[in-house]
């Protein structure tokens, strides 16, 4: 599933082609996504794009009459293409732009979303989200306070959007490795110093992934059709049985609630 770096990479890739241009119309080939494509999107006409923003894993297209909320789901990607390029099997939504380009949404598993809202504030998919991990609001003191009474393992807690947004399975595993913290540690057992280190590491890992265009493991593509290159720098995720790049110990993989966790027994305590 695309996580924060992949969504931010998409935002940065599409923004120059959308802001200042006008959506002439939308083409919805298959509106049966995770939630049905909002009726307002079918009727879009002559709408200038004012901004392209991101909140958590949601892309937000600001128009004069409201907002398009896009979620990439499990396998979605957005590409900027020439308008004349014919769609392929899993190309479900196009925004046809005044500059001769089309924003094309591809989603083989159809678990993404295209929603419309007049006002962002209070929308149900955005209403209960925690702070952005790259913001000043997310820091060691905040993390320690939120972990203090939490009787759950630190990894699933990091992936809870009420704590912090956008830190999914890949980046939770990578950040915990970089901080030397075992993923099964109780959140409440982390010291303030460990929380400060973990908060710094999460920011660094996410920023590095954004620099590399995100992580492509299967479906994700950048807006220019290229894969994300952070997969080449993964330390533990997807490396079961391979030697740890630090100590040589084989990487361990476990599964809880259908999610795989990767870690090094030697480096993470």
From Swiss-Prot:
Catalytic activity reported: Hydrolysis of DNA containing ring-opened 7-methylguanine residues, releasing 2,6-diamino-4-hydroxy-5-(N-methyl)formamidopyrimidine; 2'-deoxyribonucleotide-(2'-deoxyribose 5'-phosphate)-2'-deoxyribonucleotide-DNA = a 3'-end 2'-deoxyribonucleotide-(2,3-dehydro-2,3-deoxyribose 5'-phosphate)-DNA + a 5'-end 5'-phospho-2'-deoxyribonucleoside-DNA + H(+)
Keywords attached to this entry: DNA damage, DNA repair, DNA-binding, Glycosidase, Hydrolase, Lyase, Metal-binding, Multifunctional enzyme, Zinc, Zinc-finger
The keyword Transport belongs to this UniProt entry's keyword annotation: no
CDD domains (alphabetical): EcFpg-like_N
The protein's required cofactors: Zn(2+)
SUPFAM superfamilies from the UniProt entry: Glucocorticoid receptor-like (DNA-binding domain), N-terminal domain of MutM-like DNA repair proteins, S13-like H2TH domain
Positions bound to DNA: 90, 109, 150
Pfam families reported for this sequence: Fapy_DNA_glyco (PF01149), H2TH (PF06831), zf-FPG_IleRS (PF06827)
Start-end of FPG-type zinc fingers: 235-269
This enzyme's EC code(s): 3.2.2.23, 4.2.99.18
Entry's Gene Ontology BP terms: base-excision repair
Active site: 2 (schiff-base intermediate with dna), 3 (proton donor), 57 (proton donor), 259 (proton donor)
Molecular function as annotated in GO: 8-oxo-7,8-dihydroguanine DNA N-glycosylase activity; class I DNA-(apurinic or apyrimidinic site) endonuclease activity; damaged DNA binding; zinc ion binding
Cofactor binding note from Swiss-Prot or TrEMBL: Binds 1 zinc ion per subunit.
Highest taxon listed in the record's lineage: Bacteria
Assigned protein family: Belongs to the FPG family.
Subunit structure: Monomer.
Function, in words: Involved in base excision repair of DNA damaged by oxidation or by mutagenic agents. Acts as a DNA glycosylase that recognizes and removes damaged bases. Has a preference for oxidized purines, such as 7,8-dihydro-8-oxoguanine (8-oxoG). Has AP (apurinic/apyrimidinic) lyase activity and introduces nicks in the DNA strand. Cleaves the DNA backbone by beta-delta elimination to generate a single-strand break at the site of the removed base with both 3'- and 5'-phosphates.
Protein name per Swiss-Prot or TrEMBL: Formamidopyrimidine-DNA glycosylase
Gene: mutM
């Amino acid at each position: 599933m695309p996580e924060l770096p992949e969504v931010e990479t998409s935002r940065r890739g599409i923004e120059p082609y959308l802001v200042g241009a006008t959506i002439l119309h939308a083409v919805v080939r298959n509106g049966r996504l995770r939630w049905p494509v909002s009726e307002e999107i079918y009727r879009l006409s002559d709408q200038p794009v004012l901004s392209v923003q991101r909140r958590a894993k949601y892309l937000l297209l600001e128009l004069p009459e409201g907002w398009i909320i896009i979620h990439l789901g499990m396998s979605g990607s957005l590409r900027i293409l020439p308008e004349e390029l014919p769609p392929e099997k899993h190309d479900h939504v196009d925004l046809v732009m005044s500059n001769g380009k089309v924003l094309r949404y591809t989603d083989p598993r159809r678990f993404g979303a295209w929603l419309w809202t007049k006002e962002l504030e209070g929308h149900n998919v955005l209403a209960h989200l925690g702070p952005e991990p790259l913001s000043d609001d997310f820091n060691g003191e905040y993390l320690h306070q939120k972990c203090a009474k939490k009787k759950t393992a630190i990894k699933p807690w990091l992936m809870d959007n009420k704590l912090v947004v956008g830190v999914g399975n890949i980046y939770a595993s990578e950040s915990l490795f970089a901080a030397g913290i075992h993923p099964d540690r109780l959140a409440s057992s982390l010291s303030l110093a460990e929380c400060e280190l973990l908060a710094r590491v999460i920011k660094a890992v996410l920023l590095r992934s954004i620099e590399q265009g995100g992580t492509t493991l299967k479906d994700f593509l950048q807006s220019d059709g290229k894969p994300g290159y952070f997969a080449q720098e993964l330390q533990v995720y997807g490396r079961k049985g391979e030697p740890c790049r630090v100590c040589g110990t084989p990487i361990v993989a476990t599964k809880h609630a259908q999610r795989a966790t990767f870690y090094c027994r030697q480096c993470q305590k």
